[in-house]
UniProtKB/Swiss-Prot annotation:
This is Indole-3-glycerol phosphate synthase. The gene is trpC. Keywords: Amino-acid biosynthesis, Aromatic amino acid biosynthesis, Decarboxylase, Lyase, Tryptophan biosynthesis. Its EC number is 4.1.1.48. Pathway: Amino-acid biosynthesis; L-tryptophan biosynthesis; L-tryptophan from chorismate: step 4/5. GO terms for biological process: L-tryptophan biosynthetic process. It catalyses: 1-(2-carboxyphenylamino)-1-deoxy-D-ribulose 5-phosphate + H(+) = (1S,2R)-1-C-(indol-3-yl)glycerol 3-phosphate + CO2 + H2O. InterPro entries: Aldolase_TIM, Indole-3-glycerol_P_synth, Indole-3-glycerol_P_synth_dom, Indole-3-GlycerolPSynthase_CS, RibuloseP-bd_barrel. Belongs to the TrpC family. GO terms for molecular function: indole-3-glycerol-phosphate synthase activity; phosphoribosylanthranilate isomerase activity.
């Protein structure tokens, strides 16, 4: 685990402990039970990919540890509507506060604004966060293999499936990919092209790991995707689903940016 990921996970555990003390499991469970039904994140991506179009998970991200503030004029609902109008299939919303300036309210606002399924993009270290995600209305959660051992990853995935949510497994290298294929059952295998130690992106990561992916799993290419040529390069190795955030967040008109990439 990289130093920054370890720091983020330690901070997240402390934050989760604080929230659990303030909101007992019974209370967050009641909220989750009252939430609108999951919208089918994985199925939405499959429908788009099967139609021959790029299946885009468009990300709503205000800031990051490496880049700082990315989008000063940040309005989750406005961004969600622009993404939807431009043809995005799903949304990803950062809810981590300490490092990404995210918030649960951002996910709630984005999901209320459009009919698209939404991924809660956060550092999941405790099954309690899964119930919390469903209470927010999330349709999918992220499981980062670099942040969890196999048992914890499987436990969090099982909890998500119990709540009817999908899971996006995220890997960065061959070792994590092999672990994900062994300990998780989700078909969504996200390959993050960003090196967690250097923060450099390299599309060759997806090209390498694509060779490991069996027929019952689907590739989601993440990070470093900026042009249609990049998407074509990923499609050539079997990735027809893409998670893109910072590139869009830096554009004056995110809708135009999406159309330029997938239109």
């Amino acid at each position: 685990m990289s130093d920054i990921l370890r720091e983020i996970c330690d901070t997240t555990r402390a934050e989760v402990a604080r929230r659990k003390a303030a909101l007992p499991l019974a209370d967050v469970t009641a909220r989750a039970e009252d939430a609108n039904a999951p919208r089918g994140f994985a199925n939405a991506l499959t429908r788009t990919a099967d139609s021959g179009r790029p299946a885009l998970i468009a990300e709503i991200k205000k800031a990051s540890p490496s880049a700082g503030l990315i989008r000063p004029d940040f309005n989750p609902a406005v961004l969600a509507r622009a993404y939807h109008a431009a043809g995005a299939t799903c949304l990803s919303v950062l809810t981590d506060g300490p490092y990404f300036q995210g918030h649960a309210d951002f996910l709630i606002a984005a999901r209320a604004a459009v009919p698209l399924p939404v991924l809660r993009k956060d550092f999941m270290v405790d099954p309690w966060q899964v119930v919390e995600a469903r209470a927010m209305g999330a349709d999918c959660i992220l499981v980062i293999l670099a942040a969890l051992d196999d048992g914890a990853a499987a436990e969090i995935e099982a909890c998500a499936h119990d709540w009817g949510m999908d899971v996006l497994a995220e890997v960065h290298n061959e070792e994590e990919c092999a672990r994900a294929l062994t300990c998780l059952t989700t078909p969504l295998l996200g390959v993050n092209n960003r090196n967690l130690k250097t923060l450099v992106t390299d599309l060759a990561v997806t090209e390498r790991l694509a060779k490991m992916v069996p027929a019952d799993r689907v590739l989601v290419a993440e990070s470093g995707l900026r042009t249609r040529k990049d998407l074509d390069r990923m499609t050539a190795v079997g990735a027809r689903r893409f998670l893109i955030g910072e590139h869009f967040m830096r554009q004056p008109d995110v809708g135009d940016a999406v159309r330029a990439l997938i239109g």
